[in-house]
């Protein structure tokens, strides 16, 4: 069986939503027995659409020989979502908010690491300068260590 792609599941979900909307409209305009058959037909269509969606989203073992032909429409079995995003959606929150908060958190972490890196580089340079002045016989070794750790040579 060929793997089910993301676009197939997307189409199935759109069909389910469309059937729900049609049922909502039919219930809102319900006139009694004369519209009952139409409502029953719409409910049967919804049931069929849900069955199709369910069969398409059953967990299948991915085939070893199915190469990902279209990266913009991957097989549904290859898509993995972080549990945090699923929790956001379950809590009726926008997953874009999670993404924004995650990016901001990573940026703050990067700024912290950059500050630490700059502080250690400054400490390295001060230590090297002090060691050169206190122990001139170690000047070559100090210069080698400074170069190896990303610093420039100081004279």
Curated annotation (Swiss-Prot):
Subcellular localization, as worded in the UniProt entry: Nucleus
Which InterPro entries does the entry link to?
Mediator_Med10
Gene Ontology CC entries for this record? mediator complex
Q: How does it assemble?
A: Component of the Mediator complex.
Entry's Gene Ontology molecular function annotations: transcription coregulator activity
Q: What is this protein called?
A: Mediator of RNA polymerase II transcription subunit 10
Q: Would the keyword Transcription regulation be found if you checked this record's keyword annotation?
A: yes
Which source organism does the UniProt entry give?
Aspergillus terreus (strain NIH 2624 / FGSC A1156)
Superkingdom of source: Eukaryota
Annotated region Disordered: the residues are: 54-80
One Gene Ontology term of the biological-process aspect is: regulation of transcription by RNA polymerase II
The family note in this entry says: Belongs to the Mediator complex subunit 10 family.
The UniProt entry lists the main location of this chain as: nucleus
Q: Which Pfam families match?
A: Med10
List UniProt keywords, sorted A-Z. Activator, Nucleus, Transcription, Transcription regulation
Keyword Transcription present in the record's keywords: the answer is yes
Role noted for this protein: Component of the Mediator complex, a coactivator involved in the regulated transcription of nearly all RNA polymerase II-dependent genes. Mediator functions as a bridge to convey information from gene-specific regulatory proteins to the basal RNA polymerase II transcription machinery. Mediator is recruited to promoters by direct interactions with regulatory proteins and serves as a scaffold for the assembly of a functional preinitiation complex with RNA polymerase II and the general transcription factors.
């Amino acid at each position: 069986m060929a793997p089910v792609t993301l676009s197939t599941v997307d189409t199935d979900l759109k069909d389910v939503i469309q059937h729900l909307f049609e049922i909502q409209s039919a219930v809102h305009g319900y006139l009694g027995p004369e519209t009952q058959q139409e409502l029953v037909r719409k409910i049967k269509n919804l049931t069929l659409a849900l069955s199709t969606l369910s069969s398409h989203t059953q967990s299948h073992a991915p085939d070893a020989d199915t190469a990902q032909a279209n990266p913009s429409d991957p097989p549904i079995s290859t898509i993995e979502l972080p549990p945090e995003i699923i929790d956001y959606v379950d809590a009726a929150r926008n997953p874009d908010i999670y993404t924004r908060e995650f990016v901001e958190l990573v940026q703050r972490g990067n700024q912290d690491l950059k500050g630490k890196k700059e502080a250690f580089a400054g400490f390295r340079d001060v230590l090297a300068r002090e060691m050169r002045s206190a122990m001139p016989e170690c000047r070559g070794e100090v210069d080698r260590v400074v170069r190896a750790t990303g610093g420039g040579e100081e004279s």
